[in-house]
Structure formats: C-alpha cells, structure tokens
C-alpha cells in the first residue's frame, strides 16, 4: 500500500494520506452511528419521535447544505485549513455529545458534526490530490473509496457491538478519538496550499444557496410533527423558494457565479444527477429505516440488527469493482440502469418481506438492493465529470456531490413524512376513544420504527392493529421508492444509453 509522493517528504505525504483515509472511515461511521444509537439515546434521554429524528436530520441538514460552500471556501482559502478546522469541530462536537444530558443540545451537536463533515469531505479529496500525481493519485483515490466502503459496510456492526458493550456515549467517544487523530496527523503532515492568485468566492451567492437549501430541507423535516399545511412548514417553503429565486438571479448577473446554470442544459448531466437520487431511494434510505425496524419493530439488539444490515452494506465492497469490469462490454449508463432495475425489484421484495415478516426473504431483498445500488455507485463520479465540457468539470463535480448529499437529507425527510402520514391515516380510521394528538404521536412512533412506544400510547388496542398499520406504511413506502428508482432508471437510460446520448467508454473490442 506504499504510495510514491509528489512532495519531497515521502513519509509526510503518507501520513497526510493517512489522515484523509481516517476521515473517510470516520464519516460513514458517524452517519450510521446516529441511527444505531437513537434507540439507546431515547432510553437514556427520552424525547419524542420528532426530537429524536434530529439526531439524523440535524447531521444531514448541515452536511448537505454546507458542502458546496465548504468546497468553494477550501479552494479560495486553503484546503488544509478547512480540513483541520473541520476535524477540530468534529472532535469538539463529538466530545461534547458524550457529556450531554439534553436531547435538544444533542441535536445541535449533531448539526455541528454535519457542518464539520462537509468541511472534511469538501477539502479532504482536494488535499489528497495535492500529494500524488498520475497513477499514484489514482491508487490513492482507490484506497480512499475502499476505506469509505469498509466504513459503510462494517460501521453498523462495530457500532452495534460498541453500544451493547459500552453504551452510546462510548460510540461518540470513539468519534472524538478518531477525529483527534485526523486533526493531529493532518496538522503536521498535510502540505499548505501552493501560492496562487487569490480568489474571492461569491459570498452572496453561496449564502443564498446554502440558506435556500437548508430552509427547504428543514421544511420537509418538520412535516411529520407539524403537518404539511402548518404555518411553520409553509413559511419555510416560501422562504426557501424566495432565496432560490434570488440565487438564480444572482447567478445570471455575476461573472463568477457559484453555479453556471448552463450546466443543466446538458441532458447527459441531468441524467447523471438522477443517479444519486436513485441510489438514495434504493440504498441510503434503507441504511436509516432498516436498522430502526430491526431494533424497534422486531426487538433486536443493536448488534443483531447490524448483522442483518450487512446483507445491504456488504455488496458495496464488491459490486463497484464488478461495475468497472462490466464497462469493458457495456456503457456505464447501461450498467447503472441494470443495477437500478435490480434494486427496484429488491425494494418490491422488501415491502412484501416486511408485511409477511419472512426473514430470509428480507435478507435476499437487502442483498438485491445493495448490489443494485453498488453498480452505479462506483461509476457516478466519473459520469458526472464526463457529461460536461472539461472546463466545467470541477463545478459539475461540486454540484453532483451537493445533489448527492443534500438529496439524502431531503429523501430521509420525505420518508419520515410518508411513514407518519400513512400510519396516522390508518390509525385514525381504526382507533377510537383517543385524542387526535395521542393518535398522531403513536403514528409518529410507528413511523420511527418504535412499536413498543406506540403500543404504550394506545394500551387498549391490540398489537395486531398497530402491526397492520406499521406493515402497510412500509409496503406503501417501498412501493413508492421502487417507482421513483424505476423512473430514474428510465430517464438515465434515455439520457445516457440511447444513440447520441451514451457516454463513450472503452469496450472489449476497442
């Protein structure tokens, strides 16, 4: 695994790469850790489903909203400074999370972790690119992707066993320890930015975009607790819409826009932007709701649920390489479309498995979803860059990553709203003698995958009624996710695979 550095100090560069690799391991651990620790935190600190959801929502809200701003700032100022600042913020917020006894403060600290993650992700890849050239750079980024995949595949298992052994506070102590290592190693080994012409970022454009995206995502996140037509939801939607309009106007009027809107005139690039939307529906969303189902709906421990979740995550270690091999004979668009169709079948099978409570079928469905999503996963970044002119590749990559991460937060908010709404409608039609707010709270717990809490609110009704509501909500959700994934696959086929739209790639006959 030795890499030849482009800088005079080979070992300093190797240490710098190590800090980036450690960060690549930390981010997926933190993402899945927020989910796996939620039931334990609820038992320790209490809280409603809406309050507990911010342990995940808070992280995704700031992670997605600040990613573009962090990347632009890193390019304009110094990638090392942004990377180190992000690691320091991550370490501090994780350490404070270990000590907190307040759920609201926990949500705030998770939001700070999301901001720190955006800073680390946006600057880490660029910092790694400074260390190596040519084939060695390719190898370094291959290792980076592998480490990220390992964190995603085995992170839930590690965290599940840690919760069983030392509790949720020990998990966040591990995050603090890892981020401290990233901070110290990166501080002494990453090279400072090379002197170049100073660039002033479009601060107003970045602010408008970040606030618009944050308010829009927040408006979706409050729907389960407030309702779609509530004053809070509508105010957030209107404010985000106004900010998006102002952002578009700003982009049209300045010479150095945050985003060149002409990128969206490239049909292939629009098709590529649908890839993270599809993989979010058939993979990332499942990383959240499946372990919550295992722990709250099936009564499994954290470590048991993590073992079953590996059916979803393990294919991510293997199938990206399979996808790269398949591009010798098929175009990336064709491979991606086939993978999404496989994942759609897995989602439909998953809905039936939830309803029938057939565990082997559920495991098979998770494998199909994981393998199907993994096929386009390793091809997406290259497709994003190749779908636009070379001069706009950097901006295209920035927009693509923003859509990927922000889309995950938006999708999770929509999923939560759908599950809560479906359970609310079912319970309102079948449960009588309880106040509407009690029924809504029970529906919220069912939407969060917590059957015991819902049953405690409705003690006069059998678990069978709650289970039927729970199962029908998930069946509806998985059917909807399958439809969205299939529609994305169709659009990707039309934009990337049809004659005149396919992105050229080397095949076996070339």
Predicted regions and their residues:
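C-terminal membrane-cytosol helix-exit motif in multi-pass small-molecule transporters
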Residues: 176-195, 210-222, 239-253, 489-496
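12-transmembrane solute porter fold
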Residues: 15-30, 34-36, 49, 204-206, ...
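Helix-loop-helix hairpins in multi-pass membrane proteins, especially solute transporters
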Residues: 67-205
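Hydrophobic transmembrane architecture of multi-pass small-molecule transporters
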Residues: 404-494, 509-510
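Central cavity-lining transmembrane alpha-helices of secondary-active solute carriers
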Residues: 57-71, 125, 310-322
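Extracellular/periplasmic helix-loop-helix junction of adjacent transmembrane segments
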Residues: 37-65, 303-307
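Cytoplasmic loop-to-transmembrane helix junctions
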Residues: 51, 136-143, 392-399, 473
């Amino acid at each position: 695994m030795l890499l030849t550095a482009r800088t005079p100090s080979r070992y300093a560069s190797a240490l710098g790469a190590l800090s980036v690799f450690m960060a690549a391991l930390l981010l997926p651990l933190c993402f899945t850790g927020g989910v796996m620790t939620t039931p334990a935190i609820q038992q320790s600190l209490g809280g409603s489903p809406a309050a507990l959801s911010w342990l995940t929502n808070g992280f995704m809200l700031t992670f997605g909203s600040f990613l573009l701003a962090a990347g632009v700032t890193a390019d304009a100022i110094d990638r090392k400074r942004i990377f180190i600042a992000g690691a320091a913020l991550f370490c501090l917020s994780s350490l404070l999370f270990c000590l907190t006894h307040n759920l609201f403060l926990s949500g705030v600290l998770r939001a700070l972790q999301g901001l720190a993650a955006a800073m680390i992700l946006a600057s880490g890849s660029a910092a790694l690119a400074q260390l190596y050239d040519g084939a060695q750079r390719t190898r370094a980024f291959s290792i980076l992707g592998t480490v990220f995949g390992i964190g995603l595949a085995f992170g839930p298992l590690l965290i599940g066993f840690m919760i069983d052994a030392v509790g949720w506070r020990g998990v966040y102590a591990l995050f603090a320890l890892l981020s401290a290592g990233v901070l110290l190693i990166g501080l002494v080994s990453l090279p400072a930015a090379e002197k170049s012409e100073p660039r002033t970022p479009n601060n107003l454009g970045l602010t408008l975009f970040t606030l618009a995206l944050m308010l829009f995502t927040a408006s979706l996140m409050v729907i389960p607790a407030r309702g779609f037509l509530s004053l809070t939801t509508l105010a957030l939607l209107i404010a985000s819409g106004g900010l998006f309009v102002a952002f578009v106007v700003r982009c049209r009027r300045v010479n150095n826009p945050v985003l060149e809107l002409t990128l969206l005139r490239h049909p292939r690039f629009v098709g590529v932007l649908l890839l993270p939307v599809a993989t979010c529906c058939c993979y990332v969303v499942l990383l959240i709701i499946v372990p919550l189902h295992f722990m709250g709906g099936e009564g499994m421990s954290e470590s048991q649920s993590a073992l079953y979740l590996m059916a979803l995550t393990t294919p991510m270690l293997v199938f990206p390489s399979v996808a790269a091999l398949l591009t010798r004979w098929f175009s990336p668009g064709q491979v991606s479309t086939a993978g999404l169709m496989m994942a759609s079948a897995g989602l439909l099978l998953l809905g039936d498995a939830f309803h029938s409570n057939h565990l082997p079928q559920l495991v098979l469905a998770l494998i199909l979803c994981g393998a199907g999503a993994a096929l386009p996963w390793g091809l997406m970044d290259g497709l994003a860059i190749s779908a636009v002119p070379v001069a706009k590749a950097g901006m295209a990559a920035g927009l693509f990553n923003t859509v990927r991460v922000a889309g995950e937060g938006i999708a999770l908010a929509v999923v939560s709203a759908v599950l809560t709404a479906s359970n609310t409608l079912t319970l309102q039609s079948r449960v009588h003698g309880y106040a509407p707010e009690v029924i809504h709270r029970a529906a919220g717990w069912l939407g969060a995958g917590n059957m015991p809490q819902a049953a405690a609110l409705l003690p006069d009704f059998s678990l069978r009624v709650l289970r039927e509501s729970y199962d029908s909500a998930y069946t509806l959700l998985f059917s909807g996710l399958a439809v969205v994934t299939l529609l994305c696959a169709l659009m990707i086929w039309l934009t990337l695979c049809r004659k005149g739209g396919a992105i050229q790639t080397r095949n076996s006959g070339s």
